[in-house]
Amino acid sequence: MSDKPLTDVTFSSFDLHPALVAGLESAGFTRCTPIQALTLPVALPGGDVAGQAQTGTGKTLAFLVAVMNRLLNRPALADRKPEDPRALILAPTRELAIQIHKDAVKFGADLGLRFALVYGGVDYDKQRELLQQGVDVIIATPGRLIDYVKQHKVVSLHACEICVLDEADRMFDLGFIKDIRFLLRRMPERGTRQTLLFSATLSHRVLELAYEHMNEPEKLVVETETITAARVRQRIYFPSDDEKQTLLLGLLSRSEGARTMVFVNTKAFVERVARTLERHGYRVGVLSGDVPQKKRESLLNRFQKGQLEILVATDVAARGLHIDGVKYVYNYDLPFDAEDYVHRIGRTARLGEEGDAISFACERYAMSLPDIEAYIEQKIPVEPVTSELLTPLPRAARVPVEGEEADDEAGDSVGTIFREAREQRAAEEQRRGGGRSGPGGGSRSGSGGGRRDGASAGADGKPRPRRKPRVEGEAPAAAAQTEKPVVAAAAAQAPSVGMADAERAPRKRRRRRNGRPVEGAEPAVASTPIAAPAAPRKPTQVVATPVRAANKSSGSPSLLGRIGRRLRSLVSGN
């Protein structure tokens, strides 16, 4: 990025399809950003591109223009069926795929192109029906698309003439590289297919992928004075763990009304921080892997509309999402990866705007700071944690935004969101027949929890009796239960026998599990009546003979004894 995010190059100066130019102008795009001005002269004639540019520089529009212009100006491959896609755009995360699809529809709705958005976490059958009907462009995450290609043969990529890999470095981080190679092998060979690759960093592994599956790609790098956005004002505080929430509330109270994102490292802290902010009167949304996909989309949409003041998220929202007007980004937890820091603060100061990036370096995550400063090649200014900042200012009455009343009635509180998420996850695990929690699941606590703590429901809906571990040589449980009354009655009438007869019954070995005796693994009940115990015999006392006493009573004295007697005889003169 630079202080001048737009160049003097206009989209109309390129040989674009007239309908595409009209769509760009109607969407408000007239001049190119640096990455767009570098990419389009290479991509429009059909060349492969390996582009490096930071987030928020307009990479999405660069490859969307190249894809749509190719599909509008060039005929499809000869062996293409009407339902086969002509272009594939791959993104590492669902949120990024949704954002790309939204931008594509924004200025490409009137071009006659059919778009399909494919990602996990939503209705599988609806996406399959859409693909079977036929589309021109698929915008997808690798996992769900491979499921359609590999397992169900829903879609074929043999006629895909252009492929885009967005955030390629993130693909490696998330372990998608094998999936990417699998999909590229199902497309036309690289001499026929055009491939556009974009990444925040063109590392060795990214370039290796480019040269392996691309046709002599041209490496394009947007030179910047700094890796981070020039208009981001960065500062860092060093609070203790106990001061972080109070400091966050104090800083938020001094920036009332500003659209804010708060990043944390774990899903558990998303819920904890969001609950704290909600208790203090803030309207909060959450983005993490625990939140269902539909709810994530709804919360993100409300945040973009201004119905939510703060969005608390993990790194799932750190890349690719373009949210207008984000003024503050808080790193509540410093990220472990320096690149994640750059992508987090890239949510603000996009396309020439200004913003603030505020980080907390507590004792738990402060060790990441040297790597971050080395990566961005600058020292982050340090601000002191004062008692004034730890005191939140009184909040002014907030003017409600249109649509907030309906959302309040829907009950989209943080607690409700996570409770519904846990219930939905438990229901899905039960529906799949597995899982360690929920009814019938196998949890060690709760009613109906599994073998140890409760019985699962039978075919008639009634709870089954708990099944005891079977011991080797033991009769079946049902037979043993039916014999218990008979055995008890016979035992009462049986004559007494000696203890020796009772001891002749075979002993059953007690099985052990994980070093602990299995509960209920007692010796099996004999099929014959159990004899009543005989009267106890008087115990026999066994007296051990001391060793020295035994030596004294023996006929042969010890060596020391013989020496002693010899000395005494010499002294006495005998």
Curated annotation (Swiss-Prot):
Catalytic activity from the UniProt record: ATP + H2O = ADP + phosphate + H(+)
Basic residues compositional bias, start-end: 506-515
EC primary class: hydrolase
Annotated Gene Ontology cellular component terms: cytosol
Species annotation: Xanthomonas oryzae pv. oryzae (strain KACC10331 / KXO85)
Stated name of the protein: ATP-dependent RNA helicase RhlB
Compositional bias (Gly residues): 435-449
Family to which the UniProt record says this protein belongs: Belongs to the DEAD box helicase family. RhlB subfamily.
Biased composition (Basic and acidic residues): 423-432
Residue ranges annotated as motif DEAD box: 166-169
Helicase ATP-binding domain mapped to chain residues: 40-220
